[in-house]
Amino acid sequence: MADQLTEEQIAEFKEAFSLFDKDGDGTITTKELGTVMRSLGQNPTEAELQDMINEVDADGNGTIDFPEFLTMMARKMKDTDSEEEIIEAFKVFDKDGNGFISAAELRHIMTNLGEKLTDEEVDEMIREADIDGDGQINYEEFVKMMMAK
């Protein structure tokens, strides 16, 4: 399954994996998974976190290593995000609920995820997704960006 991913996707997932793997030991624990989920506005129970890990923990050692993470991501990409999930994600980014994601909101979320981005990088992300050129991302643009992965 993971062999259907492009090199670019694998590189992106490696980056995401390192965001989760806070102590850099090459595995994601329930604690690390919980930290990231909470920074995204989710509030999973310990049992839910354990279930998420068990789902992809091929060798049964209680943590997720990178190959297991890749398999999970490949699976997730196959059953592409439901519209509901995309709406939820949009709401997480759209802090003030005005229907747009501003550069400030994007920067805030990325910083929460542990991504220290320069203003240029944030502006570049906005520019890439900002089809109508108004300097912010509306829902349609967000959906296109999410589906383009």
UniProtKB/Swiss-Prot annotation:
Residues modified as N-acetylalanine are A2
Q: Which GO terms describe its cellular component?
A: myosin II complex
Q: Which residues bind Ca(2+) 1?
A: D21, D23, D25, T27, E32
SMART domains in UniProt: EFh, efhand_Ca_insen
What positions does the entry give for Ca(2+) 2 binding? D57, D59, N61, T63, E68
Q: Which PROSITE patterns match?
A: EF_HAND_1, EF_HAND_2
SUPFAM superfamilies to which the protein is assigned, alphabetical? EF-hand
Give a yes or no for keyword Phosphoprotein in this entry.
Answer: no
Which residues does this entry mark as bearing N6,N6,N6-trimethyllysine? K116
> Keyword Metal-binding, does the record have it?
yes
Q: Which Pfam families match?
A: EF-hand_7
- Binding locations of Ca(2+) 4: D130, D132, D134, Q136, E141
**Per the similarity annotation, which family is this?**
Belongs to the calmodulin family.
Q: What else is known?
A: This protein has four functional calcium-binding sites.
Q: What is this protein's name?
A: Calmodulin
Which lineage do the record's taxonomy fields give for this organism? Answer: Eukaryota, Sar, Stramenopiles, Ochrophyta, PX clade
